[in-house]
Amino acid sequence: MFIESFKVESPNVKYTENEIHSVYDYETTEVVHEKTVNGTYQWIVKPKTVKYDFKTDIRVPKLGVMLVGLGGNNGSTLTAGVIANKEGISWATKDKVQQANYFGSLTQASSIRVGSFNGEEIYAPFKSLLPMVNPDDVVFGGWDISDMNLADAMARARVLDIDLQKQLRPYMENIVPLPGIFDPDFIAANQGSRANHVIKGTKKEQVDHIIKDMREFKEKNKVDKVVVLWTANTERYSNVVVGMNDTMENLMESVDRDEAEISPSTLYAIACVLEGIPFINGSPQNTFVPGLIDMAIRNNVLIGGDDFKSGQTKMKSVLVDFLVGAGIKPTSIVSYNHLGNNDGMNLSAPQTFRSKEISKSNVVDDMVASNGILFEPGEHPDHVVVIKYVPYVADSKRAMDEYTSEIFMGGKNTIVMHNTCEDSLLAAPIILDLVLLAELSTRIQFKSEGEGKFHSFHPVATILSYLTKAPLVPPGTPVINALSKQRAMLENIMRACVGLAPENNMIMEFK
């Protein structure tokens, strides 16, 4: 049975006019290596319970979202999709009359189990757990190195049906991105022809320009909060150098002296941290150099990333988790992609492809490390990623994977998968989820037993990891890539905010 909304009734939960307060018992285990009476050592697992207090501000703000790369395929597709939903637009395809929807969005189109009623499991919308911004109410803006208006950008992208594009054109033809930061050293040379709309000046002047843009956007649109997200070109990796970008002070001094190795994406992130605005990196480059992470932590400003997890990598994080969890040993993973959009064109340059290769290749590491029966220390499957640019297929990316595994008694198993990923139609709802969850997380505070004051989540937002290929985590924190674990973490934290136990799937009431 599906219900639209619910309210938790519990002595551990209190609803006020502006907040939800919950007291939550977090049950976990501590593992220690202890010496026994006979002098040997053994592993001891100790269950423990930690009491947490959560409070969530339920006053939903008017949200502004600024996209870096607003005129790209992702930016134009997302903006078009939100307008279509807000205006209730329908359009004719060769199959049917299609209604606008938010399919592909975790927050808007997925459900959670809340319990059982008369022997039947009860489900509710994911977004019913906590008050979230309605995507129809989001105000979009942003930057692009091309001055093309969003109606023409939508047509150039060739993502949406023509009938829909015609209906959306009046809403989008007057939306023109602000000029963006352009540095040809960080992206493919073939992007130069688009760059007719750029911010001039030194890196310090560019940061100041972005800050001015954000302030004016917030004032003009009368929004309460702004979230900035990078959905522009993949950059090459920045060199991390002691004395240049390893600390907040060194990074800011490097900006002041116009250091060439500070990338455009890092400049946007610096501007956001200085303004207290959450910044999310949707591409695979190392935007968050150590100095930027240091800066975000010290200023307590949310940062999240890296790289949208939309198609092939999402499947990989599910399939490898299944194989390793089933006691099957993946020994070779070969992933081939070809695509024809501007992302593919930019990735045809070796230096930008390397950024993508790293983010796509590391996705299986934690799953391999979890099973010492299958894998010796340091052992890892052969893992190859190939991306080629084929203009004809446009935004309809093809992903082909071959998984070879060892099975019982020396046998071999091979799984071959073909995945046609409509790149921007998969990425757009992920962008939406990232900005909505980033905003929500800024309204949640908590404290553990013994802590005197409530505080926010760590500025490095692991809560967003379900949506990213290479999750950014605080120093010393394990990286989790298995998709089911990432979703469970996000859902269970939100459940804790309303005093609900984690969904453990034991269903003891029916045993």
Swiss-Prot record:
The keyword Lipid biosynthesis applies. Pathway: Polyol metabolism; myo-inositol biosynthesis; myo-inositol from D-glucose 6-phosphate: step 1/2. It catalyses: D-glucose 6-phosphate = 1D-myo-inositol 3-phosphate. GO terms for cellular component: cytoplasm; cytosol; nucleus. InterPro entries: Myo-inos-1-P_Synthase (IPR002587), Myo-inos-1-P_Synthase_GAPDH (IPR013021), NAD(P)-bd_dom_sf (IPR036291). Expressed in siliques, leaves, roots, seed endosperm, but not in embryos. Highest expression in leaves, but restricted to vascular tissue in older leaves. GO terms for biological process: embryo development ending in seed dormancy; inositol biosynthetic process; myo-inositol hexakisphosphate biosynthetic process; phosphatidylserine biosynthetic process; post-embryonic development. Keywords: Cytoplasm, Inositol biosynthesis, Isomerase, Lipid biosynthesis, Lipid metabolism, NAD, Nucleus, Phospholipid biosynthesis, Phospholipid metabolism. Induction: Up-regulated by the IPS1 protein itself. Down-regulate upon flagellin treatment. NAD(+) binds at residues 71-74, 144, 181, 191, 194, 231-234, 282-283, 307, 310, 341-343, 356, 394-395, 423-424. Its main location: cytoplasm. Its cofactor is NAD(+). One of its GO terms (molecular function) is inositol-3-phosphate synthase activity. Its EC number is 5.5.1.4. It is found in: Cytoplasm, Cytosol; Nucleus. Disruption phenotype: Shorter seedlings with deformed cotyledons and altered root cap organization. Spontaneous lesion formation on mature leaves when plants are transferred under long days. Enhanced basal resistance to pathogens and increased sensitivity to abscisic acid during seed germination and root growth. Key enzyme in myo-inositol biosynthesis pathway that catalyzes the conversion of glucose 6-phosphate to 1-myo-inositol 1-phosphate in a NAD-dependent manner. Catalyzes the majority of myo-inositol synthesis required for plant growth and development. Acts as a repressor of programmed cell death and protects plant cells against cell death under high light intensity or long days. Controls its own transcription by inhibiting ATXR6 activity. Reduces the deposition of inhibitory histone marks on its own promoter. Belongs to the myo-inositol 1-phosphate synthase family. Homotrimer or homotetramer. Interacts with ATXR5 and ATXR6. This is Inositol-3-phosphate synthase isozyme 1. It comes from Arabidopsis thaliana (Mouse-ear cress).
